[in-house]
């Protein structure tokens, strides 16, 4: 496994693989890796001959400077994890490599509509930062496939829309949310939880699961289910940002006869902001 830090170096590596007709996969990360990230790497290895994992803490997707500053940087530990998974290259660029014109002069890539609701409404500019850095990474590496997790469901839809709208020759693959045994979705931000908060954190998964099961049983008054979900979280000591039921394909508000839905929630528990979702697939509604 090689650690490459410059655009020229990683492009040179990719050019060599392409000359040998090898397929390249990219797994974009911000580091502080956990089992969820490693599952992405495993899937990427199934889809390509060479896997590149990028590690770059992207300031453009943080709307809170303190959040950016305290985001865990664990590069040495991340390297050890990835070395065991057959990764070909870890791409760890500097801020100047990714944004050579400095942050105040960056050319942004933004998906309108989808980027402004739910998570986008709570974290202004967040998705613009995500799509900008992903577009830059795609342009640098030009992978045939990139792998993302379904835990960040809205992000996944936005990246797929960006790729489709800009005719990027990249396949966007996803894997199901990786969870601990108690249901808590794995996240780098789980490290912010105290021991007591960690014990309560799976209540978020429970609230989503309850809503999903109730929908499967035929309940269609979604506003009541959303309020019930928020109240479950408040009662457990969470501070919810949102708890919504949306159409799975575009996150629009459902009309009541859709077959594919998703329940999405975000809530603070102490200093940790947890997000999760639960997809709901229904039989055809007569």
Curated annotation (Swiss-Prot):
<keyword id="KW-0436">Ligase</keyword>
<keyword id="KW-0963">Cytoplasm</keyword>
<feature type="binding site">
    <location>
        <begin position="149"/>
        <end position="152"/>
    </location>
    <ligand>
        <name>ATP</name>
    </ligand>
</feature>
<dbReference type="Pfam" id="PF02569">
    <property type="entry name" value="Pantoate_ligase"/>
</dbReference>
<keyword id="KW-0566">Pantothenate biosynthesis</keyword>
<protein>
    <recommendedName>
        <fullName>Pantothenate synthetase</fullName>
        <ecNumber>6.3.2.1</ecNumber>
    </recommendedName>
</protein>
<dbReference type="InterPro" id="IPR004821">
    <property type="entry name" value="Cyt_trans-like"/>
</dbReference>
<comment type="pathway">
    <text>Cofactor biosynthesis; (R)-pantothenate biosynthesis; (R)-pantothenate from (R)-pantoate and beta-alanine: step 1/1.</text>
</comment>
<feature type="binding site">
    <location>
        <begin position="30"/>
        <end position="37"/>
    </location>
    <ligand>
        <name>ATP</name>
    </ligand>
</feature>
<feature type="binding site">
    <location>
        <position position="178"/>
    </location>
    <ligand>
        <name>ATP</name>
    </ligand>
</feature>
<feature type="binding site">
    <location>
        <position position="155"/>
    </location>
    <ligand>
        <name>(R)-pantoate</name>
    </ligand>
</feature>
<dbReference type="GO" id="GO:0004592">
    <property type="term" value="F:pantoate-beta-alanine ligase activity"/>
</dbReference>
<keyword id="KW-0547">Nucleotide-binding</keyword>
<dbReference type="InterPro" id="IPR042176">
    <property type="entry name" value="Pantoate_ligase_C"/>
</dbReference>
<feature type="active site" description="Proton donor">
    <location>
        <position position="37"/>
    </location>
</feature>
<dbReference type="GO" id="GO:0005829">
    <property type="term" value="C:cytosol"/>
</dbReference>
<keyword id="KW-0067">ATP-binding</keyword>
<dbReference type="InterPro" id="IPR014729">
    <property type="entry name" value="Rossmann-like_a/b/a_fold"/>
</dbReference>
<comment type="subunit">
    <text>Homodimer.</text>
</comment>
<dbReference type="GO" id="GO:0005524">
    <property type="term" value="F:ATP binding"/>
</dbReference>
<dbReference type="InterPro" id="IPR003721">
    <property type="entry name" value="Pantoate_ligase"/>
</dbReference>
<comment type="function">
    <text>Catalyzes the condensation of pantoate with beta-alanine in an ATP-dependent reaction via a pantoyl-adenylate intermediate.</text>
</comment>
<feature type="binding site">
    <location>
        <begin position="186"/>
        <end position="189"/>
    </location>
    <ligand>
        <name>ATP</name>
    </ligand>
</feature>
<feature type="binding site">
    <location>
        <position position="61"/>
    </location>
    <ligand>
        <name>(R)-pantoate</name>
    </ligand>
</feature>
<comment type="similarity">
    <text>Belongs to the pantothenate synthetase family.</text>
</comment>
<dbReference type="GO" id="GO:0015940">
    <property type="term" value="P:pantothenate biosynthetic process"/>
</dbReference>
<feature type="binding site">
    <location>
        <position position="61"/>
    </location>
    <ligand>
        <name>beta-alanine</name>
    </ligand>
</feature>
């Amino acid at each position: 496994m090689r650690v490459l830090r410059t655009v020229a170096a990683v492009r040179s590596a990719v050019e060599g693989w392409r000359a040998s007709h090898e397929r390249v996969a990219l797994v974009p990360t911000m580091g502080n890796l956990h089992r969820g990230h490693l599952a992405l790497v495993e899937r990427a290895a199934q889809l390509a001959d060479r896997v590149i994992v990028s590690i770059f803490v992207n300031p453009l997707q943080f709307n809170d400077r303190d959040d950016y500053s305290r985001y865990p940087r664990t590069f040495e530990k991340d390297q050890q994890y990835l070395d065991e998974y057959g990764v070909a290259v870890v791409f760890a660029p500097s801020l100047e490599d990714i944004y050579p014109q400095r942050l105040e002069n960056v050319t942004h890539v933004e998906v309108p509509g989808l980027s402004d609701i739910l998570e986008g409404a709570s974290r202004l500019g967040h998705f613009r930062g995500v799509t900008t850095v992903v577009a830059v990474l795609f342009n640098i590496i030009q992978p045939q496939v990139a792998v993302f997790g379904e835990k960040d469901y809205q992000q996944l839809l936005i990246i797929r829309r960006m790729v489709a709208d800009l005719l990027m020759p990249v396949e966007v693959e996803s894997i199901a949310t990786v969870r601990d045994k108690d249901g808590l979705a794995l996240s780098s931000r789980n490290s912010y939880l105290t021991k007591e908060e960690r014990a309560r954190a799976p209540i978020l998964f429970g609230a989503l699961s309850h809503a999903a099961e109730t929908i499967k049983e035929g309940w269609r008054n979604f506003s009541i289910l959303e309020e019930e979900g928020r109240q479950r979280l408040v009662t457990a000591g969470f501070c919810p940002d949102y708890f919504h039921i949306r159409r799975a394909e575009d996150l629009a508000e459902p009309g009541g006869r859709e077959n594919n839905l998703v329940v999405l929630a975000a809530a603070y528990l102490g200093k940790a902001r947890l997000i999760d979702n639960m997809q709901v697939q229904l039989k055809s509604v007569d």
